[in-house]
């Protein structure tokens, strides 16, 4: 859960940097650096999230749990580009879409905090290595 929270925080910072920092300080080097850091966050979040599923979900329904996760993810892949496209058409700028993307990071951060609390309460061992 800690890696999920760190990745979420980085994601929030990167998208807010695109929304508010780059328009004030336009720099290709800064933009590339932010993209590279955003790539790190996109690695940390799934690296923390996917291994936690079998630690939380009973083995009998693990396949169904992965099915639900992929189902939700695919709905997001369908709807988010449509929403962002409509926002871009309405506003003509990228500030609001970047704020929307950073809000996804906020939701992930809240989920990470909740997951960490549940781990502490129920002892899932989410911070422990998978191989002993």
Which sequence ranges carry the predicted segments?
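Multi-pass alpha-helical transporter architecture, strongest
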Residues: 19, 99-132
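Interfacial helix-cap and linker-helix signal at transmembrane-aqueous boundaries
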Residues: 84-92
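Discrete transmembrane alpha-helix packing/kink hotspots characteristic
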Residues: 76-80
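Intracellular helix-loop hinge segments at the cytoplasmic ends of transmembrane helices
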Residues: 50-56
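Alpha-helical transmembrane segments of multi-pass secondary-active solute transporters
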Residues: 3, 65, 87, 96-101
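Transmembrane alpha-helical cores of Major Facilitator Superfamily
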Residues: 9, 67-75
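Loop-to-transmembrane helix entry/capping segments in MFS-fold secondary transporters
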Residues: 59-69
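C-terminal transmembrane helical hairpin of 12-TM major facilitator-type secondary transporters
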Residues: 2-49
């Amino acid at each position: 859960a800690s890696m999920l929270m760190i990745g979420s925080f980085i994601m929030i910072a990167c998208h807010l940097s695109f929304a508010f920092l780059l328009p004030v300080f336009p720099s290709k080097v800064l933009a590339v650096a932010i993209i590279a850091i955003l790539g790190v966050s996109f690695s940390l979040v799934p690296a923390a999230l996917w291994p936690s599923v079998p630690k939380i979900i009973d083995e009998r329904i693990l396949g169904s749990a992965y099915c639900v996760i992929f189902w939700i993810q695919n709905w997001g892949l369908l709807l988010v580009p449509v929403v962002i496209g409509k926002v871009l058409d309405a506003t003509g700028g990228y500030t609001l879409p970047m704020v929307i993307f950073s809000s996804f990071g906020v939701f992930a951060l809240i989920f990470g905090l909740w997951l960490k609390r549940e781990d502490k309460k129920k002892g899932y061992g989410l911070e422990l290595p998978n191989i002993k």
